[in-house]
A protein has these predicted regions:
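N-terminal interaction/assembly modules
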Residues: 1-108, 162-185
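Short, charged/polar micro-motifs that form catalytic or ligand-binding hotspots
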Residues: 96, 110, 139-142
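Short, mixed-charge amphipathic alpha-helical segments
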Residues: 105-112, 134
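A short pre-motif secondary-structure segment
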Residues: 120-121
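Helix-turn-helix DNA-binding module
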Residues: 127-144
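DNA major-groove recognition helices of helix-turn-helix
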Residues: 145-163
Length: 185
């Protein structure tokens, strides 16, 4: 059970961090993706440039012995280096894409919270207001306030880990806002 509690605390820290720094995290991720894309373009350009060199004919004898073979080996080694770098950059782009999707999904999950829980989480983590100030403004006992805060984090975790698509989460969010408006009337 201790491992489960530790995992839940880690998820909670990630959720808090994403909510606090959502825009900045997305901006950084997209900037990294642009940098990786530029590197991929450069490697592709180098690959095309290398491929355009005249072929090395190994059947021609050279006065210097193995000069053609050495040049051919260097050429093959460089081609392999380029392929390896390109694969690594594509993998990095894949990781960055997953990271951006995760940030976006956490924020979507936050959007579907019930009104009170949403307002608590929004003020504490998104707006960065002091816990004690928010608690006092809600006029709830500490125990009830903390239960609502924990419940909100739990909802975000559960929806994040669910099989729901992001589109389905958006529909939940839209449904919640309609229900909330009906409750206010």
């Amino acid at each position: 059970m201790s491992d489960l509690n530790n995992a839940m605390r880690v998820y909670e820290k990630i959720i808090k961090n994403v909510l606090r720094h959502h825009d900045e995290l997305l901006r950084q991720t997209y900037e990294q993706m642009i940098d990786v894309r530029k590197k991929i373009d450069e490697i592709t350009r180098q690959s095309i440039e290398i491929a355009s060199y005249p072929k090395i004919d190994l059947s021609i004898e050279s006065n210097r012995g193995g000069e053609h073979r050495d040049l051919f080996d260097a050429y093959l080694k460089y081609q392999k280096l380029i392929r390896t770098q390109k694969e690594e950059l594509i993998n990095e782009m894949h990781v960055l894409t997953i990271q951006a999707e995760g940030i976006h999904r956490i924020y979507l999950c936050f959007q579907i919270l019930p009104r009170v829980e949403y307002r608590i989480i929004n003020r504490i983590y998104v707006k960065g207001e002091l816990y004690k100030t928010v608690e006092e403004d809600f006029g709830l006992s500490h125990r009830i306030f903390e239960q609502k805060r924990q419940q909100a984090i739990q909802i975000i975790q559960n929806v994040y880990k669910s099989d729901l698509s992001n589109e389905q989460i958006v529909y939940l969010c839209k449904g919640n806002s309609i229900i909330q408006k009906e409750r206010d009337v």
